[in-house]
C-alpha cells in the first residue's frame, strides 16, 4: 500500500527531519505538510489537500494518528481513521483488518 505523510510542521523542523530521517521519508509517496498547504490539522483544507494528492475515495484511505481530535476531523472527511495507541495495538488492528 502506498504511504503518505500528513504533518503539522514548519520549515525549520522539517529541515531537521529531512536531514536526520531521509531513509524513513523515502517510503512515502508524497508529503502533505502544513506549512506548504497553508493549513493545519484539524482544519478541513489540509485533509482536502490529502484527498487531492491520494486521488482515492476517502473511505479507501486509512489514516493513522495519535491525536483523537485529528482522528475525529479525518472521519468528518470520510476517511477511515484509527487512533494510534501502541505498536502492538496497531498490529492487532491491521491483523483484524486483514492487512498484516
List each language-model region with its residue ranges:
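Short acidic capping loops at alpha-helix termini that bridge into adjacent secondary structure
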Residues: 26-30, 58-61
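Substrate-recognition element of Asp-dependent hydrolases with the DxDx(T/V) motif
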Residues: 1-18
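Short, acidic loop-to-helix structural element flanking the phosphoryl-transfer center
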Residues: 1-4, 44, 87-88
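Conserved Lys-Pro-Asp/Glu-containing loop-to-beta segment of HAD-superfamily phosphomonoesterases
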Residues: 40-68
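Short, solvent-exposed loop/turn segments at secondary-structure junctions
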Residues: 9-12, 37-38, 68-69
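His/Asp/Glu-enriched short active-site or ligand-binding loop at hydrolase and phosphoryl-transfer sites
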Residues: 28-38
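Acidic, Mg2+-coordinating phosphoryl-transfer loop and its flanking beta/alpha structural elements
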Residues: 58-94
Amino acid at each position: 500500500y502506498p504511504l503518505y505523510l500528513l504533518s503539522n510542521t514548519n520549515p525549520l523542523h522539517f529541515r531537521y527531519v529531512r536531514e536526520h530521517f531521509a531513509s524513513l521519508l523515502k517510503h512515502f509517496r508524497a508529503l502533505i505538510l502544513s506549512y506548504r498547504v497553508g493549513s493545519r490539522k484539524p482544519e478541513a483544507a489540509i485533509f482536502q489537500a490529502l484527498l487531492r494528492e491520494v486521488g482515492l475515495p476517502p473511505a479507501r484511505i486509512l489514516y493513522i494518528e495519535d491525536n483523537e481530535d485529528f482522528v475525529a476531523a479525518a472521519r468528518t472527511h470520510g476517511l477511515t481513521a484509527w487512533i494510534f495507541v501502541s505498536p502492538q495495538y496497531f498490529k492487532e488492528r491491521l491483523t483484524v483488518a486483514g492487512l498484516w
